[in-house]
Curated annotation (Swiss-Prot):
Zn(2+) 2 binds at C823, C897, C904, C907. Its cofactor is Mg(2+); Zn(2+). Mg(2+) binds at D464, D466, D468. Belongs to the RNA polymerase beta' chain family. One of its GO terms (cellular component) is DNA-directed RNA polymerase complex. Gene3D superfamilies: 1.10.132.30, 1.10.150.390, 1.10.1790.20, 1.10.40.90, 2.40.40.20, 2.40.50.100, RNA polymerase II, clamp domain, RNA polymerase Rpb1, domain 3. The gene is rpoC. This is DNA-directed RNA polymerase subunit beta'. It comes from the Bacteria. Binds 1 Mg(2+) ion per subunit. It comes from Polynucleobacter necessarius subsp. necessarius (strain STIR1). It catalyses: RNA(n) + a ribonucleoside 5'-triphosphate = RNA(n+1) + diphosphate. SUPFAM superfamilies: beta and beta-prime subunits of DNA dependent RNA-polymerase.
Length: 1420
């Protein structure tokens, strides 16, 4: 019995630790881990199958193979625990020690660790300052290295010099034997490492760093300094990179399993260890035999190779292979990659108490319920049932309980019912792309074998019932059940965390039913009746006196919320009013929760409207009411859809009568363009662009005509007049309500299919004029197949890409958690409505909703405060702000948050998934990553929905005013008047604004270069008026001066080519690509100069630079040599490439490249300073552009000749303005315009991609990612801190260090912001565990080990890996409580120690008194 009690005492308590340190193990350390040396390569005896003594599975070293039993069987049972058998030497203990006891191999010759040799940059090379090539030659016995020059003359030989065999012999002959020491192999390298004096090296490098000026040297020194300093601080000795002892993994971690038929399955590691032991033993023998040097050398080399293979097979040379010719899996492979230790077993484990089954719809369930098959429940809840059976005394032992459950007696089912009540279970559907992919439900027991799922949660799970499967998990502990219920219950997760929209929105049939019931129709049965209340309406409807859609008047009582603080019915005040409505709406209004007005439902309920309805309900009536309301909507919807009995017939696809005419007109126009092309008025490219445009427009027209005919129908009203009303056509109703299908799809059914794209994305210029109702001919069908096939191929490829993007995003943000309420930041960003092309893309309300404002928001007229400083802006505030016409609001943002190693709640604002201010402990980083990653996958899976039908945006060619007001131009707008008196824009960044009578900006439009302005500044503008027009298909080059054109370098066949159109015979001059020219003319650039009547150059106003207009490649010259040119005349046209269809296929890589912060290929060049432009001396292929700033300093840019320069001589440019066209480089934006501009750029660009697909993501998620991309800074001047110039450090770390230095009155470090791509940012995190589990495991671990890094376990990932609660949510408070408790314990211990000390210092008599008082014996 005592032994049993001792056994219980043995259980190890939880070890509390706060950091994990990684380092290199010294030989002594390895020996201290070991339980004995492995001397033999044998594993087990072939006859007895028992482990061989001193072999790889030796029981003496690693422990017994059976619990409490020695190998020879002399000692068995618990009572001999801890005894070491004198016969076989095995300790009697648990067999599981074979999982933790290590052995070791004493190597006969030192061996270099391959990771420190070959992982780039080579750490050995760095420390020794030798090249990898040289070190390898020494290690693999091809060369000698000088360890000690000895007595050789000064300068003849230095430490670390490499010598070949011949040189060595020559030198030995020259200086005599034993004068100097040079060794081959790892011993030489080890001796070199031992002789390094690190402190002295560090001092000399620091001195060199200060002295040198070259960037390359600074970089090299800084790298080496970092490594050496790490050795200094971590106490790791460099020579430990060379191993003298090799640790042996515990045998249970490299098992040897007998298979049927007498064969064995074994881990590859055993093979690798065996080779090492064999070669090591052979080497020992050779050394004892004093074998010739060359043989020993070969054996040493083979030993080195064997150890290399064990550690990282295939890293150097050919990989070692087993009997079946496949490379063996080494220790390194065990930990890296998807199937390695980190990702396979630590970050995601298989879970017990789980099951999976097919899902079916459960329309009768409540939102928080799911149907669980009885058999499944019985299996999952077994332990609970056993427990209950025992407490009730039905079964006496667990074994009896098991029998009872297996026989499935009636009592078991009763107990199951009881156990399951209010015990939430979790359902998960793969792929789990966001946090709504796992939700908790209360199980209802059902017959059958399929799980029933509530229809409203399908949107969150992205589930449908075509065979999807879901997994069930059971939270076991009380805490787990509590968290599942409060945080994960489906009825507590009704909003999408990505955008704050409701996730429990009905779809498909339900929407159709609700829509059908809330439509109204003219002259319906019983139209014009008046009802006293809703009960009367129901009675009349059931009696068949009215139809659902009839227009009637009903007296309705609504309840308004008057007191938000009150409880129950006291919150509401009723008010009764007669409404003109339809029967269906009146009946439906019965399910509205109190506090919602009838107006909300008094309209046809389309999908968007229903979403708005649920959203309003959530904001006004709270969560509970909303969930009940959603459930009722669902029930009503299903019932109404059934009653409506909507069906589809082929006659419902009405082909518009005007289709023939539209297509004929389009064909005529196309023929017209063909003619123009024949006669040479347009180029083939222009003709193609126009043809595609014509057919695009024709398709839209047919679509519009079809929708007009489909959506309206003429009926007689009750006075006998013919009126138009919305049609009750089934297909139209489905699309209009948002239940199924879209206008684009109906267009393919009944309009025309339109333009199709080729597999490469270019548009085929002959459209499919037929639709599916008419049927396609063979050619049309063939053209369609491209799109369909491309869609499927895309889907397969994109799913993987999108998943990878999500993984990178999660990894970069995983440690970002809200850790405090308020950081006290006073800076933020000023939000305006997002306007593009004159249209408001995102209204101000959407951008500021759920953020915290900075400063009071005041009434524009009365100046009274309407929203005080530091308020979270909710719907009411935002509506008020919009109503007052305030058009910009300053709000706090994640990017300006001052919290270190986390965020504060105020800067983040509203938690979109819950609707209030974010809680401390919320893992906002992961939520952001999921919100951005999830639609990526969704969209990619949806590329093919419009089967390649070329859904391309029509090219804008003019600006129309959307509102009334006065026209203003921005300060950057420059205009010239041409000979016809038109105003031609010659600025690149000009904008037209429309302001209202109060001077508030209503809209803003970018006006491109070369556009014609139709109105003068300050002119009154009416909505719908055109402000400017331009040719969208070519870009002009416009003369700003008058004169006579004189061509320079415009030589046919040299710089320009005559393009004679084969068909028309007309010719134009086109500038040809420099690459296609002869060598002599490569650097020459065709230029048009302007000269006046006297033959002198026309000068640029205010300068002495002549006007010369450079022509870029592809420009078509429209003037002739010697022609008189007026101001504003077009000198040349540059055709714009045809558009490829855009679809998220382009989008996903675009998002990835933004987050990876890649510099685009032909990036725009931005002005680095504000100043005046001039052109310097040209080089061979480049032109030199000089910007002279106000202080007269010149900044030079070299720009390739073929690039279009947007500025000209004498122009003044502002810092950050574009000088050469191209996509912007985010790194430039950061350095020239700062963090705020960069964030705006990335947010806008990412949002553009998602918006194109109609996906809503809140800006703050993208800002969170940007914050993580900016989390490192580069030190430019270390001041008095411990950093090195050019070192990249964590921003929070630098701030902490600076605070410390400033507190001591010294100089803080100066730094530059650095933008890192998400992969780079993940790998450069301070936590090596997180980085190693992400990518490049070997490199990360090698670096961490050399540096002796410590991981403070701050992020989520590190904690998951070591098996702890994550420091977020409940885990954060748990951890804080533990910290407080530990601090308290420490303080208490100190207090007690202090008191004891004080007592010890007191006089002796008092001490005696104290003892007498307490009645205890004197401790002495």
């Amino acid at each position: 019995m005592k032994a049993l009690l001792d056994l219980f005492k043995q259980t190890q308590g939880d070890e509390q630790f706060d950091v994990i340190k990684i380092g290199l193990a010294s030989p002594e350390k390895i020996r201290s881990w070991s339980f004995g040396e492995v001397r033999k390569p044998e594993a087990i005896n072939y006859r007895t199958f028992k482990p061989e003594r001193d072999g790889l599975f030796c029981a003496k070293i690693f422990g017994p193979t059976k619990d409490y039993e020695c190998l020879c069987g002399k000692y068995k049972r618990l009572k001999f625990r801890g005894i070491i058998c004198e016969k076989c030497g095995v300790e009697v203990t648990l067999a599981k020690v074979r999982r933790e006891r290590m052995g070791h191999i004493e190597l006969a010759a030192p061996v270099a660790h391959i990771w420190f040799l070959k992982s780039l940059p080579s750490r050995l090379g760095m420390v020794l300052d030798m090249t990898l090539r040289d070190i390898e030659r020494v290690l693999y016995f091809e060369a000698y290295v000088v360890v000690d020059p000895g007595m050789t003359p000064e300068g003849a030989m230095k430490r670390g010099q490499i010598m070949s065999e011949d040189e060595y012999i020559a030198k030995t002959e020259e200086y005599g034997d034993g004068v100097f020491t040079a060794i081959m192999g790892a011993e030489g390298i080890r001796d070199l490492l031992r002789s390094i004096d690190i402190d002295r090296e560090v001092e000399t490098i620091r001195a060199d760093l200060k002295a040198t000026g070259s960037d390359a040297k600074i970089k090299k020194y800084a790298k080496r300094l970092k490594v050496l300093e790490a050795f200094q601080t971590s106490g790791i000795k460099p020579d430990w990179m060379i191993m003298e002892v090799l640790p042996v993994l515990p045998p249970e971690l490299r098992p040897l399993v007998p298979l049927d038929g007498g064969r064995f399955a074994t881990s590859d590691l055993n093979d690798l260890y065996r080779r090492v032991i064999n070669r090591n033993n052979r080497l020992k023998r050779l050394l004892e035999l004093r074998a010739p040097e060359i043989i020993v050398r070969n054996e040493k080399r083979m030993l080195q190779e064997a150890v290399d293979s064990l550690l990282d097979n295939g890293r150097r040379g050919k990989a070692m292979t087993g009997a079946n010719k496949r490379p063996l899996k080494s220790l390194a492979e065990m930990i890296k990659g998807k199937s390695g230790r980190f990702r396979q077993n630590l970050l995601g484990k298989r879970v017990d108490y789980s099951g999976r089954s097919v899902i079916v719809v459960g329309p009768t369930l409540k939102l928080h319920q799911c149907g669980l098959p009885k058999l499944m429940a019985l299996e999952l809840f077994k332990p609970f049932i056993f427990n209950k059976l025992e407490t009730l005394g039905i079964a006496t032992t667990i074994k009896a309980a098991k029998k009872e459950v297996e026989s499935q007696t009636p009592i078991v089912w009763d107990i199951l019912e009881e156990v399951i009540r209010e015990h939430p279970i979790m359902l998960n559907r793969a792929p789990t792309l966001h946090r709504l992919g796992i939700q908790a439900f209360e199980p209802m027991l059902i017959e059958g074998k399929a799980i029933q799922l509530h229809p409203l949660v399908c949107a969150a799970f992205n589930a449908d019932f075509d065979g999807d499967q879901m997994a069930v998990h059971v939270p076991l502990s009380l805490e787990a059940q509590m968290e599942a219920r409060t945080l994960m219950l489906a009825s507590n997760n009704v909003l999408f965390p990505a955008n704050g929209e409701p996730s429990i929105v009905p779809s498909q049939d339900v929407v159709l039913g609700l829509y059908y019931a809330t439509r109204d129709k003219i002259n319906g049965k019983g139209e014009g009746m008046v009802f006293a209340n809703i009960t009367e309406v129901v009675r009349a409807y059931e009696a068949g006196q009215v139809e659902l859609a009839s227009r009637v008047a009903v007296r309705i009582t609504e309840y308004e919320i008057v007191d938000k603080k009150a409880e129950g019915d006291a919150r509401f005040a009723g008010k009764t009013k007669i409404y003109q409505t339809s029967v269906g709406r009146a009946i439906l209004s019965e399910i509205l929760p109190k506090g919602m007005s009838f107006e909300e439902i008094n309209k046809p309920l389309k999908k968007k409207e229903i979403s708005r309805l649920i959203n309003t309900s959530f904001r006004k009536c709270g969560l509970r009411e909303t969930v009940i309301f959603a459930d009722r909507l669902l029930q009503s919807g299903f019932r109404l859809a059934t009653n409506a009995g909507i069906s589809v017939a082929i006659d419902d696809m009405l082909i518009p009568t005007s289709k023939e005419r539209i297509i004929t007109e389009a064909s005529t126009k196309v023929k017209e363009y063909d003619k123009q092309f024949m006669s040479g008025l347009v180029t083939n490219q222009e003709r193609y662009n126009n043809v595609v445009d014509i057919w695009g427009a024709a398709g839209d027209q047919v679509g519009k005509a079809m929708m007009d005919e489909l959506s309206h129908v003429d009926v007689l009203d009750r006075n006998g007049k013919t009126v138009r009303q919305e049609s009750f056509n089934s297909i139209y109703m489905m699309a209009d309500s948002g239940a199924r299908g879209s206008a684009a799809q109906i267009r393919q059914l009944a309009g025309m299919r339109g333009l199709m794209a080729k597999p490469d994305g270019s548009i085929i210029e002959t459209p499919i004029t037929a639709n599916f109702r008419e049927g396609l001919n063979v050619l049309q069908y063939f053209i369609s197949t491209h799109g369909a096939r491309k869609g499927l191929a895309d889907t397969a490829l994109k799913t993987a890409n999108s998943g990878y993007l999500t993984r990178r995003l999660c990894d970069v943000t995983q440690d970002l958690v809200v850790i405090e309420e308020d950081c006290g930041a006073t800076t933020g960003v000023t939000m305006k409505a997002l306007v593009e092309g004159g249209e408001i893309i995102e209204a101000l309300r959407d951008r500021i909703l759920g953020r915290v404002c900075i400063g009071d928001i005041v009434h524009p007229d009365t100046q009274e405060v309407i929203v005080p400083n530091d308020t979270l802006l909710d719907e009411d505030h935002v509506d008020q702000i919009v109503a007052l016409g305030i058009d910009e609001v300053k709000v706090r943002t994640v990017l300006s948050c001052l919290t270190r190693f986390g965020l504060c709640a105020k800067c983040y604002g509203r938690d979109l998934g819950r609707g209030g201010l974010v809680n401390v402990g919320e893992a906002v980083g992961v939520i952001a990553a999921q919100s951005i990653g999830e639609p990526g996958t969704q969209l990619t899976m949806r590329t093919f929905h419009i089967g390649g039908a070329a859904s391309r945006a029509l090219v804008a060619s003019n600006i129309e005013a959307k509102s009334n007001g006065a026209l203003k131009f921005s300060g950057t707008m420059r205009v010239v008047k041409n000979s016809r008196g038109e105003q031609i824009v010659i600025s690149r960044s000009g904008e037209a604004l429309i302001v209202d009578e109060n001077g508030r900006e209503r809209e803003r439009h970018k006006v491109p270069y070369g556009a014609t302005l139709l109105l003068k500044e300050d002119a009154a503008v009416k909505a719908g008026a055109s402000l400017a027009t331009w040719d969208p298909l070519t870009r002009p080059i416009i003369s700003e001066y008058a004169g006579i054109a004189r061509f320079d370098n415009v030589e046919e066949g040299v710089t320009v080519a005559k393009q004679v159109d084969e068909i028309t015979g007309l010719s134009t001059l086109v500038v040809i690509d420099g690459k296609r020219r002869s060598a002599a003319s490569k650097g020459v650039r065709p230029v048009i100069n302007l000269i006046d009547d006297k033959g002198n150059d026309v000068m640029i106003a205010g300068t002495d630079h002549p006007v010369n207009i450079g022509l870029q490649v592809g420009a078509l010259i429209t003037v002739k040599d010697g022609q008189k040119v007026e101001v504003g005349e077009v000198l040349a046209r540059i055709p714009i490439e045809s558009q490829k269809t855009r679809d998220i296929t382009g989008g996903l890589p675009r998002v990835a490249e933004l987050f990876e912060a890649r510099s685009p290929k032909d990036a725009a060049v931005l002005a680095k300073v504000t100043g005046t432009v001039s052109f310097g001396k040209e080089t061979k292929g480049k032109q030199r552009l000089v910007i002279t700033d106000m202080d007269g300093e010149a900044n030079e840019f070299l720009i390739p000749k073929e690039k279009q320069v947007l500025v000209h001589d004498g122009q003044v440019v502002n810092k950050g303005e574009m000088i050469v066209e191209g996509p912007a480089d985010p790194h430039d934006i950061l350095t020239l315009k700062g963090i705020e501009e960069l964030a705006i750029y990335i947010v806008d660009e990412v949002q553009d991609v998602y918006r194109l697909q109609g996906v809503k993501i809140n800006d703050k998620h993208i800002e969170v990612i940007v914050r993580q991309m900016l989390r490192r800074v580069q030190v430019t001047d270390p001041g008095d801190t411990s950093f090195i110039t050019g070192e990249q450090v964590e921003r929070s770390k630098l701030y902490d260090e600076n605070d410390r230095v400033i507190a001591e009155g010294k100089h803080p470090a100066q730094f530059d912001n650095v933008l890192l791509g998400i992969t780079k940012a993940s790998l450069s995190t301070d936590s090596f565990i997180s980085a190693a589990s992400f990518q490049e495991t070997t490199r990360v671990l090698t670096e961490a080990a050399i540096m002796g890094k410590t991981d403070t376990l701050r992020g989520l990932k590190e904690n998951v890996i070591i098996g702890r609660l994550i420091p977020a949510g409940t885990g954060l408070s748990y951890r804080r409580a533990r910290k407080v408790r530990e601090q308290f314990e420490r303080d208490r211990a100190q207090m007690i120690a202090a008191e004891e000390e004080a007592m010890a210092n007191m006089p002796v008599e008092i001490e005696a008194e104290v003892v007498a008082l307490t009645g205890e014996a004197d401790p002495s």
